[in-house]
Amino acid sequence: TTINVKCTSPKQCLPPCKEIYGRHAGAKCINGKCHCSKI
């Protein structure tokens, strides 16, 4: 899932991703935007 959060590293994406998927969230930073996935 792509979310509208700007990023330079995956660490910045983990908190918003955890809000969506809980503690089983995976976070990536692709093209300056956060991508969340459920692990």
From Swiss-Prot:
Q: What else is known?
A: This toxin is only found in female specimens.
Q: What is the similarity comment for this entry?
A: Belongs to the short scorpion toxin superfamily. Potassium channel inhibitor family. Alpha-KTx 02 subfamily.
What's a Gene Ontology MF term here? toxin activity
Listed as disulfide-bonded, the cysteine pairs are 7-29, 13-34, 17-36
Q: Main localization of the protein?
A: secreted
Q: Which organism is it from?
A: Centruroides limpidus (Mexican scorpion)
**Residue numbers marked as site, Basic residue of the functional dyad:** 28
Specify one Pfam family.
Toxin_2
| Protein name as catalogued | Potassium channel toxin alpha-KTx 2.18
Anything noted about its domains?
Has the structural arrangement of an alpha-helix connected to antiparallel beta-sheets by disulfide bonds (CS-alpha/beta).
